[in-house]
Regions:
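Surface-exposed, flexible loop/turn segments at secondary-structure boundaries
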Residues: 12, 37, 83, 111-112, ...
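A general structural signal for well-ordered alpha-helical segments in protein cores
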Residues: 13, 42, 46, 64, ...
Length: 237
């Protein structure tokens, strides 16, 4: 009997755990994740903010309890792995050492936070997990102007959903067109014009230099000038 520990509980972690347990039912398979949710729909986060997804519970594909009942995999949420010793095959979880026979790292990516002044102010958010979407939705109830930094899928969807709430949104991106890895310049220009027709302000070829505010955000400083903002969404990668 083998003990397999998986660090990370979203798509890759849960899929790997379920497959390992299915192929080797007698093995002990354990997931540790620092999030409180597992197996959530990241693409749905902006639509929870906009109200199309009504409850944050709808974002969670599987609860830990459901996943364990379904697969036999043990799941520990809000448990952060802080050290790994491959020599003696142990990890440190919340200060305790846990042994393993095989270890799978499925930690995903952390949101990129630009190295600029003011990103820790109230009203500045990244978008990665359901808890982020809940914070953004709550904060947006009192916002009138938002800046979204980053014109990828999540950035565009966040801009769309904030506009649905009646918020005036400016989207900035350092690229000279929207989504250069996906669209050619002609298609990107068509999309930009359509978004502008809907009321989105799009500022391209622009870098975020600083977030301005006293305790909470009031504007952003960019290479194109200062833009007023009650809230800022960082979706730069």
């Amino acid at each position: 009997i083998m003990k397999v520990v998986i660090i990370g509980g979203v798509a890759a972690g849960t899929k790997t755990a379920a497959k390992l347990k299915r192929e080797n039912p007698n093995d002990e398979v354990i997931i540790y994740t620092k999030s409180k949710d597992i197996s959530y729909a990241g693409c749905g986060l902006p639509y929870y903010v906009g109200g199309a997804v009504e409850s944050d519970e709808e974002l969670v594909v599987n609860t830990p309890e459901k996943f364990t009942a379904l697969t036999g995999v043990s799941v520990y949420t809000e448990k952060e792995v802080t050290a790994l010793n491959s020599g003696n095959k142990t990890i440190t979880v919340n200060g305790e050492n846990v042994s393993y026979d095989k270890l799978v790292l499925a930690v995903g990516a952390e949101p990129v936070i630009p190295d600029v002044k003011g990103v820790n102010l109230d009203g500045v958010f990244t978008v990665r997990e359901p808890a982020d979407a809940v914070k953004i939705k709550n904060y947006s109830e009192n916002a009138k102007k938002a800046v979204v930094a980053g014109g990828g899928f999540i950035g565009l969807e966040m801009a769309e959903n904030l506009m649905e709430k009646g918020i005036s949104v400016t989207l900035i991106d350092m690229a000279s067109q929207l989504m250069p890895d996906v669209f050619d310049s002609e298609m990107a220009d068509l999309i930009r014009r359509k978004l502008q027709e809907k009321g989105l302000r799009v500022v391209l070829g622009t870098t975020l230099n600083a977030v301005i505010g006293d305790g909470k955000v009031s504007a952003v400083q960019t290479t194109s000038g200062e833009i007023p903002a009650d809230m800022v969404i960082l979706s730069v990668g």
